[in-house]
Amino acid sequence: MGKNYAESAKLIDKSTLYSSEEAMNLVVKTSKANFDETIDLAVRLGVDPRHADQQVRGAIILPHGTGKKVKVLVFAKGEKAKEAEAAGADFVGAEELVEKIQKENWFDYDVVVATPDMMGVVGRLGRVLGPKGLMPNPKSGTVTFDVAKALNDIKAGKVEYRVDKTAIIHVVIGKKSFGPEKLKDNFRVLMDAIIKAKPSAAKGQYLKSVSVSSTMGPGVKINPSKVLD
């Protein structure tokens, strides 16, 4: 690891579970790269994601957004395609875009939205979009006829969270330049949503561990029992 990482790591006590306020101060202080580092949240949950009734997923609009310009692909036709273009979609199309993705392995976008009538066509992409977390889904509001609202929400800083195979949720909560206060606001809104999404089938401790880190910096552990303090 580089000199910056080593210096940053000295500021963090690995055995300490910090409050969210302390953690946001530390993650900003230990972000020393010469670019605006992204701040990531990792939450390990007490669920078994192999069971359908222990899935945790959803979407929430972060009060301060993510600081990232999000490219959106919309599968729609006719009036809905025009609506998507007017609302600022980066790419709009139908079968021709499905072919482009299949033939060219084209993934130059961050979010995919589809109108329900297009899902028969988009379904053919399940194998390629699914593993990348790009498959449109009604639960996260990305399968909808209200494409303008979906686009506005995404551009306003809507993030999707989803537990992975190892029972961890990884989400971006902002940039170093946001400063501790805005990062804390985003963190709390997201943690509140994750707590409310607890499956009834999940037994025992739900929040196993919570940590934040910058792109090039060390992780900072947060006390799971005080995430909303």
Curated annotation (Swiss-Prot):
InterPro entries: Ribosom_uL1_bac-type, Ribosomal_uL1, Ribosomal_uL1-like, Ribosomal_uL1/biogenesis, Ribosomal_uL1_3-a/b-sand, Ribosomal_uL1_CS. Keywords: Repressor, Ribonucleoprotein, Ribosomal protein, RNA-binding, rRNA-binding, Translation regulation, tRNA-binding. It holds the Pfam family Ribosomal_L1. One of its GO terms (cellular component) is large ribosomal subunit. One of its GO terms (molecular function) is tRNA binding. One of its GO terms (biological process) is translation. Binds directly to 23S rRNA. The L1 stalk is quite mobile in the ribosome, and is involved in E site tRNA release. HAMAP family: Ribosomal_uL1_B. Part of the 50S ribosomal subunit. Belongs to the universal ribosomal protein uL1 family. NCBIfam families: rplA_bact. This is Large ribosomal subunit protein uL1. It comes from Clostridium tetani (strain Massachusetts / E88). The gene is rplA.
